[in-house]
């Protein structure tokens, strides 16, 4: 039986936490709604690299990834979608960007309670933030590895 390739879309999402606050960005697209730093994984880029890049582009912040909150696979008719949602912290004290550019309109730190005052892209952020604050499991970054990499890090 012949098999055709399945178009697959890969996305990286960053949940960036500072104390009890989280980083959100106001998107230029999607009706200027608030969401998390996120975007497509580019050719020859890892999910982790994409999360770091998207956060820098959309929020103006350098981050350090702490772990993985979720790995999602959504099979759809004719295609598939993969998303990796990372937990991260800011790498330094740089404030989020406040001027619009081609990537986003602005970024800010918010609490879960602040979300009710913003036009959100969906309820996902509220659930994620509440879960993180409640102690949701954070999986090691090593869970997501390049194909063929040894599990114990030994040379082949």
Please state what every model-predicted region is.
Residues 35-38:
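A short gly/proline-enriched turn/hairpin at secondary-structure junctions
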């Amino acid at each position: 039986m012949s098999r055709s390739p399945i178009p697959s879309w890969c996305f990286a999402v960053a949940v960036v936490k500072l104390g009890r606050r989280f980083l959100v960005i106001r998107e230029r697209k999607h009706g200027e709604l608030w969401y998390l730093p996120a975007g497509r994984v580019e050719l020859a880029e890892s999910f982790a690299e994409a999360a770091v890049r998207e956060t820098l582009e959309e929020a103006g912040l350098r981050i350090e990834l702490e772990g993985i909150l979720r790995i999602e696979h959504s099979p759809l008719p004719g295609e598939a979608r993969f998303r990796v949602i990372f937990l991260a912290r800011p790498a330094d004290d740089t404030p989020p960007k406040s001027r619009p550019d081609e990537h986003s309109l602005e970024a800010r730190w918010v609490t879960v309670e602040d979300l009710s005052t913003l036009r959100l892209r969906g309820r996902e952020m509220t659930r994620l933030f509440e879960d993180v604050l409640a102690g949701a499991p954070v999986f090691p970054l090593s869970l997501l590895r390049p194909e063929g990499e040894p599990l114990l890090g030994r040379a082949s």
